[in-house]
């Protein structure tokens, strides 16, 4: 079960990264070109980014509580905190990604409530951008590919 969750978690990561990067690039392009109309592509990308991000969170929580990190953390916290790799997975990876998903959720709410295209683009650039930056800083890139 753990292996299946891990493979699904890695696969959904690609969808999340693709949708979020595309959404941010679209917002940048719209800001540069001065386009202020609302775009259904932008709303679809925001929805895909949010859903895949939340799916990643749920899969990650499943991996966290079913995997070796949580077991080691609960049995020997001091040793986990001393070991860089264990601390990274047990604390830093999950903490940063949780905050990143919260930023995406806030950004999606502001995106949906925004009255005009510029406000939507600003919500995407600020919240989705910061969320992606935070999440990307804690992705185990050596294990993703």
Where do the language-model regions lie?
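Membrane-embedded alpha-helical bundles that constitute the cytochrome b-like, heme-associated redox core
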Residues: 1-145
């Amino acid at each position: 079960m753990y292996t299946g969750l891990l493979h699904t978690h890695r696969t959904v990561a690609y969808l999340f990264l693709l949708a979020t990067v595309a959404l941010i690039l679209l917002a940048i392009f719209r800001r540069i070109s001065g386009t202020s109309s609302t775009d259904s592509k932008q709303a679809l990308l925001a929805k895909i980014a949010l859903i895949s991000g939340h799916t990643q969170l749920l899969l990650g929580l499943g991996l966290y509580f079913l995997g070796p990190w949580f077991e080691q953390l609960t049995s020997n916290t001091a040793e986990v905190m001393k070991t860089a790799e264990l601390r990274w997975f047990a604390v830093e990876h999950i903490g940063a990604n949780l905050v990143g998903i919260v930023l995406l959720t806030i950004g999606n709410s502001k995106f949906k409530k925004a009255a005009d295209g510029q406000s939507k683009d600003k919500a995407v650039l600020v919240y989705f951008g910061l969320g992606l930056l935070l999440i990307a800083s804690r992705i185990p890139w050596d294990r993703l590919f």
